[in-house]
């Protein structure tokens, strides 16, 4: 389905990003595993892909750094000659009630989650415009749609990702580039592992399907949006959340 496609996935060393990288590679894409934390985790993702017959490389880069993102994209283009799929998944949380939230906690979350998404799109778009093709998939969150107590920074960043998605779809669509977002709900990752059992149980009670999502649930949606089956879909936010009662 994605043979000969080059895909960059940010924050691909764990969780949703890891699942997306593995899923895209399974469909034939050659993936670039971006990471900024554990090199060992990135190596594990690369090894998993290669053991399954796929192709992958690794690139360490802090996506909140504009110049570093520019260098990363240039290196990818130099290595492969093209970039077909960009998945903006890198994200962090620093939760806290607004009256206790530190300025640096607000800034750091927006710098990674929102500015990081802008940075990679900004530098990837030039190549995709030349190609007159490309798939950009931004990972948002239902927190950016519904809001969530204790997540003023995270919700604001993910709402910003939705606004950025809709605007970029309008700007880039005439050159054959689609831009969509996925808004996951509760997903079993390290981000949700820190939740107490009581909070998890209460959350599951609000989800009509009765469970947290799996990273693969999000990855399957990303594979669809990256494929030619989604060529006529752009400027959409696909909510993957098991239907939360609010």
Show where each model-derived region lies:
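Conserved glycine-rich cofactor-binding loop
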Residues: 6, 13-15
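C-terminal substrate-recognition "lid" of short-chain dehydrogenase/reductases
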Residues: 121, 133, 211-240, 245
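The beta1-alpha1 cofactor-binding region of Rossmann-like NAD(H)/NADP(H)-dependent oxidoreductases
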Residues: 39, 60-72, 103, 216-217
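Active-site helix of classical SDR
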Residues: 121, 157, 165
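Substrate-binding pocket helix/loop in short-chain dehydrogenase/reductase
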Residues: 97-98, 102-110, 192, 203
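Short, small/polar-rich loop/turn modules that mediate ligand/substrate recognition or access, typified
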Residues: 173, 178, 233-235
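Residue(s) in the substrate-gating loop at a strand-loop-helix junction
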Residues: 141
């Amino acid at each position: 389905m994605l043979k000969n496609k080059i895909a960059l996935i940010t924050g691909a060393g764990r969780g949703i990003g890891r699942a997306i990288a593995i899923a895209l590679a399974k469909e034939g894409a050659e993936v670039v595993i971006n990471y900024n934390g554990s090199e060992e985790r990135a190596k594990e993702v690369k090894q998993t892909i290669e053991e399954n017959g796929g192709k992958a490389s690794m690139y360490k880069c802090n996506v909140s750094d504009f110049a570093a993102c520019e260098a990363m994209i240039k290196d990818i283009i130099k290595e492969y000659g093209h970039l077909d799929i960009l998945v903006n998944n890198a994200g962090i949380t620093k939760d806290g009630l607004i009256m206790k939230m530190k300025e640096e906690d607000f800034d750091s979350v927006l710098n990674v989650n929102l500015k990081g998404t802008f940075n990679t799109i900004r530098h990837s778009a030039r190549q995709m415009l030349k190609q007159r093709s490309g798939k950009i998939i931004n990972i948002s969150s239902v927190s950016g749609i519904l809001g969530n107590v204790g997540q003023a920074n995270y919700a604001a960043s993910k709402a910003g990702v939705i606004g950025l998605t809709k605007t970029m779809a309008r700007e880039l669509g005439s050159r054959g580039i689609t831009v969509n977002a996925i808004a996951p709900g509760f997903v079993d990752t390290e981000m949700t592992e820190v939740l107490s059992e009581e909070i998890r149980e209460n959350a599951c009670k609000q989800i009509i399907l009765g469970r947290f999502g799996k990273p693969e649930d999000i990855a399957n949606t990303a594979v669809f949006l990256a494929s030619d089956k989604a060529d006529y879909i752009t400027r959409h936010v696909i909510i993957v959340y098991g239907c939360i009662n609010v």
